[in-house]
Amino acid sequence: MIFGQWVFSSNGPGQQPMGTSRPLHVLLVHVWYWPHVGGGDQHVEQIGRELVRRGHRVTVWCADVPAHEERRFRRGGVDVIRITPSRLLGGVDPLVSVSDLDLSDVDVVHLHDTLPVLIRRTLSKAKKAGKPVVTTYHNDYVKKTALGRAVKRIRWVLQGRRTIHSSDAGIVLTPFFEQLLRTKGVQGHLDIIPNGFSPVEEAPRRPSSLPKTEESTPLISFVGRLSFQKGLDVLMDAMDSCGSNPGFHLAIAGKGQLSGWLEDRHANSSAKENISVLGLVTDAEKRWMYENSACVVIPSRFEGLPTVLLEAMHAGTPVVMADVNGLGGLVQECGCGLSVPCEDPNSLAQAMSRVMEADADQASAWGGSGKSASRDYQWDRVTDRVLDVYRRVLGE
C-alpha cells in the first residue's frame, strides 16, 4: 500500500505473498499485556485475536506487572502466561526468567520490542531451540536526562540492535522508523507493517461522567494513557492560553501514572470550567466521543502509530496531531486534519481554534479523507501482512 511517502510492505525482495493454509502456533512476546493499558499491549492483543479467528493458535508471554490474580488464563482465544518478575529494573524493565517455559510446539516467535529482559531471554531461548524469530520495533522512547539518553544509546548498541540482527525478520510500523533504524546501524531487510485498529462494534454511548453542555458547544476529545509521553501538560498549557471562553469543551479520557497530576492541574487551570476529566471510558463511550467531537487532539512527545489516530480517522473525525516520528506528515498527506510542532502549547491552541473556525466543507473533507485512508489499517489487512512474514521465515 502506498500513501504519499508512506509505503507499507510485508514481502522481502523478490518475494510474493505466501499461502496461509497450515494453522500455526504463534508465540507473541511483550512485556506489558492486559490488564495493563497501552498501545503496544493493544497491538499484541489484536494481532493475537485476529490470528485466532483465522484458526491459528496463539500464546502470549508477558510480565506479571501490574500483578494479576491469574498467572495463566485465556482471553479472546489467546493463551496468556504472565511471568512473575524478581524485581523491576529501573522501574520499567521486569527481571523475569523464561527457563521453565516450553516453546517446543511453537512454530514462530514474534517479539514486540528489542531491549527488555523478557525479550532478550526469549530470543536466546528461541534461537537455541531453532525457532524462527520475528521482531517488531514499535517506538523510539524519549529520555529526559543526559544520563538517560547516554544509557539508551549504550543499551541500543549492546542489546537493541543485536535483537533485530539476531532475528529472522524485522518489522517497523512506519517508513520513519525504517529510516531511524538505518541511522542506528540496522542492516538487512525491514518489513514496514503499520499498527492496526478494530472498529468498535458496540453502539455509541455518551460517557456518564461527561457533563451536559449546550448543544451549540463543540467538543474536542483527548483519548489515551495519562503519561508524560502523551503530552498532557502541553494540552493543559494550551487550554490555559485559550482563555476562559475558548469556544469548545475539552474531554480527557484515560488513566495512567499522571492521573493524580491531572486532577491537581485541572483544579488549578484557568480553563477548568471548559475541561472534563472522564477517567477510563468504555469502548462504547470512546466511540461516542469520536463520533461527537469536532476533533481529536494528540499532543504526544513520541509515538509509534497510535491507535487513537486510526480510530479517529475511521470515525471521520478530524485530528490535531503533534508532528512526532513522521506522524504529522501522515496527517497532512492523507488530509485528515492538522499537524502542529511537538511541545508547543501555543501552536496546539491555534490549531484547535482553527478546527473550530473551519466551515462545514473543510470539516467534511478532513473527516472523509481520514475515513478513506483508515481502511488499510484495519487488523484483518495488517494481519495479512504479518502472516506473510511468518510464512516467509518458515520457508513456506
Feature roles, as predicted:
Residues 132, 142-162:
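Nucleotide-sugar donor phosphate/pyrophosphate-binding loop at the beta->alpha transition
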Residues 164, 280-281, 288-293:
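Short alpha-helical donor nucleotide-sugar binding micro-motif in glycosyltransferases
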Residues 176, 196:
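Carbohydrate-associated surface elements
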Residues 209-240, 367:
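Conserved donor-binding/catalytic core segment of Leloir-type glycosyltransferases
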Residues 263-281:
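Nucleotide-activated donor-binding/catalytic signature segment of Leloir-type glycosyltransferases, i.e.
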Residues 301:
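Aromatic "clamp/platform" in nucleotide-sugar-dependent glycosyltransferases that forms part
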Residues 318-322:
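Short hydrophobic beta-strand element within catalytic cores of glycosyltransferases
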Residues 333-334, 338-345, 355-360:
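Conserved acidic donor-binding segment of nucleotide-sugar-dependent glycosyltransferases
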